[in-house]
UniProtKB/Swiss-Prot annotation:
<feature type="binding site">
    <location>
        <begin position="74"/>
        <end position="78"/>
    </location>
    <ligand>
        <name>GTP</name>
    </ligand>
</feature>
<dbReference type="GO" id="GO:0005886">
    <property type="term" value="C:plasma membrane"/>
</dbReference>
<keyword id="KW-0342">GTP-binding</keyword>
<feature type="binding site">
    <location>
        <begin position="27"/>
        <end position="34"/>
    </location>
    <ligand>
        <name>GTP</name>
    </ligand>
</feature>
<dbReference type="GO" id="GO:0003925">
    <property type="term" value="F:G protein activity"/>
</dbReference>
<keyword id="KW-0547">Nucleotide-binding</keyword>
<dbReference type="InterPro" id="IPR001806">
    <property type="entry name" value="Small_GTPase"/>
</dbReference>
<dbReference type="Pfam" id="PF00071">
    <property type="entry name" value="Ras"/>
</dbReference>
<comment type="similarity">
    <text>Belongs to the small GTPase superfamily. Ras family.</text>
</comment>
<dbReference type="GO" id="GO:0005525">
    <property type="term" value="F:GTP binding"/>
</dbReference>
<dbReference type="InterPro" id="IPR027417">
    <property type="entry name" value="P-loop_NTPase"/>
</dbReference>
<feature type="binding site">
    <location>
        <begin position="134"/>
        <end position="137"/>
    </location>
    <ligand>
        <name>GTP</name>
    </ligand>
</feature>
<dbReference type="InterPro" id="IPR051065">
    <property type="entry name" value="Ras-related_GTPase"/>
</dbReference>
<dbReference type="GO" id="GO:0019003">
    <property type="term" value="F:GDP binding"/>
</dbReference>
<dbReference type="GO" id="GO:0003924">
    <property type="term" value="F:GTPase activity"/>
</dbReference>
<protein>
    <recommendedName>
        <fullName>Ras-like protein family member 12</fullName>
        <ecNumber>3.6.5.2</ecNumber>
    </recommendedName>
</protein>
<dbReference type="InterPro" id="IPR005225">
    <property type="entry name" value="Small_GTP-bd"/>
</dbReference>
Length: 266
């Protein structure tokens, strides 16, 4: 069966079902994951938040004239990847964030890229990842050069961008849309035309031996018996609440976004 996306619409009259893309934002504490997520969803920069809050948001996007139902998981690991299966088994693509003014966060992003590489090896699938050097507005306090970011991305074969959650929305939006494009490419490659979430599907648990060898925090990988299907994270980990976006202020269209509780938006 042909892929449901990436094809021109037949007949012009029929609307294709929106492509469903799950995106997980990974990175060390303070790298700016929440700020980037909220910037993308609301065009606003937040400066206060609850660092322990992990939530999944959804947004109806249009990428390359195609409707996309995008879910964004703003993860809240502590200092290292933990209980990674909640996003490894869920996301179609990953944004790995570090802060250009923090060498520590850059090293943290390298751990996340390694984790993704190991997961890809374990599952024999590839997972698009984009490396983001955030807080570009703080470039005068740089601890990580652009060349270092590009080199790390090159090592893992992923796209690289420097961004700022404080600066222009369009650049942040571009990066998220690039992640959607990457996910779409991968999904098309795998000819995934089946529904993405089948709750009856049983996960076969096995311990990933690679994590210990690579000094990563303990992670258990779930390999689905049908490897092309992914499970939604447990309800406790993914709270979807629809609210109106500030973008809806344009009266023409009111895209729905999901919850921003826990964030103070100015
Ligand atoms: N100057 C500047 N500050 C930023 C930027 N992005 C985030 N911050 C600030 O950096 C701090 C951490 O940002 P968060 O978005 O909460 O970082 P996080 O990665 O989600 O951190 P955890 O929630 O602890 O995992 C906050 O004080 C933000 O206001 C940015 O692009 N520029």
């Amino acid at each position: 069966m042909a892929s449901v996306f990436g094809k021109p619409r037949a007949g012009g009259g029929q609307q294709s079902a929106p492509l469903e893309v799950n995106l997980a934002i990974l990175g060390r504490r303070g790298a700016g994951k929440s700020a980037l997520t909220v910037k993308f969803l609301t065009r606003r920069f937040i400066s206060e938040y609850d660092p322990n809050l992990e939530d999944t948001y959804s947004s109806e996007e249009t990428v390359d004239h195609q409707p996309v139902h995008l879910r964004v998981m703003d993860t809240a690991d502590l200092d290292t990847p933990r209980n990674c299966e909640r996003y490894l088994n869920w996301a179609h693509a990953f944004l790995v964030v570090y802060s250009v003014d923090s060498r520590q966060s850059f090293e943290g992003s390298s751990s996340y890229l390694e984790l993704l590489a190991l997961h890809a090896k374990e599952t024999q699938r590839s997972f698009p990842a984009l490396l983001l050097g955030n807080k570009l507005d703080m470039a005068q306090y740089r601890q990580v050069t652009q060349a270092e970011g590009a080199a790390l991305a090159g090592r893992f074969g992923c796209l690289f961008f420097e961004v700022s959650a404080c600066l222009d929305f369009e650049h942040v939006q571009h990066v998220f849309h690039e992640a959607v494009r990457e996910a779409r490419r991968e999904l098309e490659k795998n000819s995934l035309a089946r529904p993405l979430f089948i709750s009856e599907e049983r996960a076969v648990h096995h311990q990933a031996p690679l994590t210990a060898r690579h000094g990563l925090a303990s992670c258990t990988f779930n390999t689905l018996s049908t490897t092309s299907l992914k499970e939604m994270p447990a309800v406790a980990q993914a709270k979807l609440v629809t609210v109106k976006s500030s973008r809806a202020q344009s009266k023409r269209k009111a895209p729905t976004l999901t919850l921003l509780k826990g964030f103070k938006i100015f």
